[in-house]
Structures are given as structure tokens and as C-alpha cells.
Amino acid sequence: ENIFIKLREAGISSIPVNSEKKPMLETWKFLQERLPSVEECEKFNNKNKYGVGVVCGAVSGNLEVIDIDNKNGIATEIFEDICKQITNNRIDLFDKLVIEKSIRNGYHLIYRCDKIEGSRKLARQKNEDGEIFADIETRGEGSYCVVYPTPGYERIQKNILKVEKITVEEREFLFDLCLSFNKYVEEKPTFTNFKQAFSEKSGDRIGDFYNERNDFIDILKKHDW
């Protein structure tokens, strides 16, 4: 059985991967633009492959994956919470999702949608060592995702060969839900004084700012403000 040919027939581009989940090709960019040929699929299957990755994005019919990572050891907890909220609010949406479990006990929610984008980090947190990890991220245009039947991967619901399309609104619901698990907000730089806010590096001088402000006030006065 050649999974690469089956994926091709389902309109999904794919790549062979090694045990470290890395592509077993010098380049796979061409597979972001077209499906592999039957001949290429045969080569992939005979390439001493370890597993299979699906190429996300337009080439695969706007395939996108929500990846619940287990780096922080809480993937199952997050996954169960997400599933509960989807089934309680959008059971029809839940039934459309292909769901798989990864070798490191992470989870993938797989779907197609008219609207997708590049990969995004939806929920992050900082661990005890101060390192920032993404608990939930997407695999979109320009990315790939390792899937079943790669060793160690399990199919929980449905088959990726029959992946369904969800609506744009349903995708937004999923994203909002995932964003609610975010525990890390990137700190934005704060200016300690006015002079720092208008530094020479920024291309603004304090004098220039005052001149522009005074010019603006003069204009307002001319118009009886």
C-alpha cells in the first residue's frame, strides 16, 4: 500500500520523512506548488522512509493543521478541554475534524478552509527556566505536518484521506478558542523618558517633534479652532 499515492488521489501533497521528522529530500519546495507525480510517489515509498508528512496550504486544497504540542507536558489536558468546548458549542464542526495523536503525545486537528495563512503561534507560555514554548500553533502555507501512518502516530477521528472543509467562521471559532489558552504576552519596550522616545536612532529629534507640533497648532488657529 502506497500512502503517498493515496494522498495524491485525495489532492494532498506529501513528503517522506525520517525518524527526526525531517524531509528525506534535498528540497521539498516544489511540493508546495504541485502534487507529487505517481513516479515520485513510488520513489518516496521505496526511499527507506520512516514516515510521511503532508504539505499544508493551497497545494493540498487549503489544508491547515492546528498542532497542540506537548513540550510542556499538558497537551492532553488542553486537547480534552478544546474538544469539550467544541462539542458543547459546535458539534457539527467537531464531526468535520480529522484528529490524530503524535508520537510525543501531541494532537493534530486537520481540516481544509477557504481562508488559511502561514503558520501561527496561537498559545504560548514561559516555563520555569524562562523559555517560551508554543502550546498551540498552526501548520499552514509553506509548512508540513507528520501524520499517520508514521510509526507512533495514531488516528483518533476520521481519515486524512477524507479531510473536510470547514467554514471561515468555524475556523475563527477554533482560533479564538485556541487563543484563549495563551499565557504569554510579549513585553513591548517602554520608554523611560521623553528623550528616549524620540532618539536619534528613530530618525526623530525632539526639536523636530516640537516644530511639527507647533506648525500643526498654527494651522488649527488659522481655521478658528
Where are these regions (language model features)?
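N-terminal structured subdomain of primase-like DNA metabolism proteins
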Residues: 191-225
